[in-house]
Amino acid sequence: MNYRYDWWPYMQAIIKRYPDRQMIFDRLGEIQQREVNAVADAIQRTAELEDGMDRLRLIKSVYWTRHRKTMAGIAMELYISRATACRWKSEFVLNVAECFGLYIRT
């Protein structure tokens, strides 16, 4: 699913910047605040899923930790397949895009 949409890299960049921008939310412009809110909403939606906490651990490992691991390595830590890990990551990016207003589920 990578780069299927023109906005895909933009959504990934929004997700990567989320922890830093969350701390300075009041000083951000309107668009940056919308970006932070989109990621926060996607996190909330993901947490409500049955396997949401595992999905959030995956997202944290992929985007927000300094120790970079391969998708296969992260999947092994979570006891899921690499394909499932890739699907969860893609679903999270789509969720952020939906919360931001760039994607509509059909």
Where are these regions (language model features)?
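Residue-level detector of well-ordered alpha-helical segments, enriched
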Residues: Y10, D54-L58, W88
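Short amphipathic alpha helix immediately N-terminal
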Residues: E50-K69
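N-terminal interaction/assembly modules
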Residues: M1-L49, T84, F100-T106
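Helix-turn-helix DNA-binding module
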Residues: R66-S81
